[in-house]
Amino acid sequence: MDKKDMEREFYMTGGDGKTSYARNSSLQKKASDTAKHITLETLQQLYKETRPKSLGIADLGCSSGPNTLSTITDFIKTVQVAHHREIPIQPLPEFSIFLNDLPGNDFNFIFKSLPDFHIELKRDNNNGDCPSVFIAAYPGSFYGRLFPENTIHFVYASHSLHWLSKVPTALYDEQGKSINKGCVSICSLSSEAVSKAYCSQFKEDFSIFLRCRSKEMVSAGRMVLIILGREGPDHVDRGNSFFWELLSRSIADLVAQGETEEEKLDSYDMHFYAPSADEIEGEVDKEGSFELERLEMLEVKKDKGNTEGDISYGKAVAKTVRAVQESMLVQHFGEKILDKLFDTYCRMVDDELAKEDIRPITFVVVLRKKL
């Protein structure tokens, strides 16, 4: 699938239905909350250094759930605190908020929440010193230019950059067949060529991402990137890649039951890559526009991940993966297998967790644009 197809067909499940991202993104929120102190400290330091009259903030890969506007609220409050401490006699800066995701994202779900967002903002400020906040959507891939030069002070990308711009071209042979048969991503059955293809695509994409943001950001601007990663050089571990291995096994289980065809499993390839810390740091150094201020590895405490009653970790993961992958799975396999697929997946995650822990790793990366 090329970049244009990916931009058109990949999106989180919209609305607020049972399988929507809005109702099934609490695992992502927990990771973002774990990193929140780093994010807000970075924004506070940026404001202290630059003190702009108008502050441009971009949320890249914003999706459409409640996490989006709650994150923006945190940003505004953080700047207000820094402002009143540093320059209390000056008026508050204006906030230009740029929400970005692929065109299929349910931006309307966010827009419908904006009236309540502004009401709460006024209430939190006692209808007094309330900042001017301008929010706009910018659909498109962040693996390309999105904004005019020198307009963005702070970039936030949470759970976005482990999604590649496309499935690596090197994953296919001369006949256009996947060389990663039986796996939807890197797994224990994958060859070295598969790992190299994904790694190469990540490096190419991440370099383009950095180059584009360097054009759009002001000098000394900051980026906070929250990325699913892996702990060491091995591409296969019981971390983030293992969740996709279990999805492969779940689909294979349906193949064995005659629910879908083996060819469909063999031809379903995801555009996901969990980088190592060395790979992230290496591309930052190589591209050269940013200084790496901070790179921390977080292991987010496992959580039931839902407020709808007691559910297992496997169920929480299954709900999250479905909300993230449903658009692509429906395109490839059809809708009728999804309930059975994720029932199987839920069971497999819980069974594996009972045998041995699964340790998904999250990186928090803070970058400062060089002067």
Swiss-Prot record:
<keyword id="KW-0489">Methyltransferase</keyword>
<keyword id="KW-0808">Transferase</keyword>
<dbReference type="GO" id="GO:0032259">
    <property type="term" value="P:methylation"/>
</dbReference>
<keyword id="KW-0460">Magnesium</keyword>
<keyword id="KW-0949">S-adenosyl-L-methionine</keyword>
<feature type="binding site">
    <location>
        <position position="28"/>
    </location>
    <ligand>
        <name>(11R)-carlactonoate</name>
    </ligand>
</feature>
<dbReference type="InterPro" id="IPR005299">
    <property type="entry name" value="MeTrfase_7"/>
</dbReference>
<feature type="binding site">
    <location>
        <position position="180"/>
    </location>
    <ligand>
        <name>Mg(2+)</name>
    </ligand>
</feature>
<feature type="binding site">
    <location>
        <position position="141"/>
    </location>
    <ligand>
        <name>S-adenosyl-L-homocysteine</name>
    </ligand>
</feature>
<feature type="binding site">
    <location>
        <position position="142"/>
    </location>
    <ligand>
        <name>S-adenosyl-L-homocysteine</name>
    </ligand>
</feature>
<comment type="similarity">
    <text>Belongs to the methyltransferase superfamily. Type-7 methyltransferase family. SABATH subfamily.</text>
</comment>
<feature type="binding site">
    <location>
        <position position="101"/>
    </location>
    <ligand>
        <name>S-adenosyl-L-homocysteine</name>
    </ligand>
</feature>
<protein>
    <recommendedName>
        <fullName>Carlactonoate CLA methyltransferase</fullName>
        <ecNumber>2.1.1.-</ecNumber>
    </recommendedName>
</protein>
<feature type="binding site">
    <location>
        <position position="269"/>
    </location>
    <ligand>
        <name>Mg(2+)</name>
    </ligand>
</feature>
<dbReference type="InterPro" id="IPR029063">
    <property type="entry name" value="SAM-dependent_MTases_sf"/>
</dbReference>
<dbReference type="GO" id="GO:0008757">
    <property type="term" value="F:S-adenosylmethionine-dependent methyltransferase activity"/>
</dbReference>
<comment type="subunit">
    <text>Homodimer.</text>
</comment>
<feature type="binding site">
    <location>
        <position position="21"/>
    </location>
    <ligand>
        <name>S-adenosyl-L-homocysteine</name>
    </ligand>
</feature>
<feature type="binding site">
    <location>
        <position position="102"/>
    </location>
    <ligand>
        <name>S-adenosyl-L-homocysteine</name>
    </ligand>
</feature>
<feature type="binding site">
    <location>
        <position position="162"/>
    </location>
    <ligand>
        <name>(11R)-carlactonoate</name>
    </ligand>
</feature>
<feature type="binding site">
    <location>
        <position position="67"/>
    </location>
    <ligand>
        <name>S-adenosyl-L-homocysteine</name>
    </ligand>
</feature>
<dbReference type="GO" id="GO:0046872">
    <property type="term" value="F:metal ion binding"/>
</dbReference>
<dbReference type="Pfam" id="PF03492">
    <property type="entry name" value="Methyltransf_7"/>
</dbReference>
<feature type="binding site">
    <location>
        <position position="268"/>
    </location>
    <ligand>
        <name>Mg(2+)</name>
    </ligand>
</feature>
<feature type="binding site">
    <location>
        <position position="163"/>
    </location>
    <ligand>
        <name>(11R)-carlactonoate</name>
    </ligand>
</feature>
<feature type="binding site">
    <location>
        <position position="62"/>
    </location>
    <ligand>
        <name>S-adenosyl-L-homocysteine</name>
    </ligand>
</feature>
<dbReference type="InterPro" id="IPR042086">
    <property type="entry name" value="MeTrfase_capping"/>
</dbReference>
<keyword id="KW-0479">Metal-binding</keyword>
<dbReference type="GO" id="GO:1901601">
    <property type="term" value="P:strigolactone biosynthetic process"/>
</dbReference>
<comment type="function">
    <text>Methyltransferase involved in the biosynthesis of strigolactone natural products, bioactive compounds promoting plant fitness and soil microbe interactions, but preventing shoot branching. Catalyzes the biosynthesis of (11R)-methyl carlactonoate (MeCLA) from (11R)-carlactonoate (CLA), downstream of MAX1; MeCLA is probably biologically active as a hormone regulating shoot branching and serves as a precursor of non-canonical strigolactones (SLs).</text>
</comment>
<dbReference type="GO" id="GO:2000032">
    <property type="term" value="P:regulation of secondary shoot formation"/>
</dbReference>
<feature type="binding site">
    <location>
        <position position="266"/>
    </location>
    <ligand>
        <name>Mg(2+)</name>
    </ligand>
</feature>
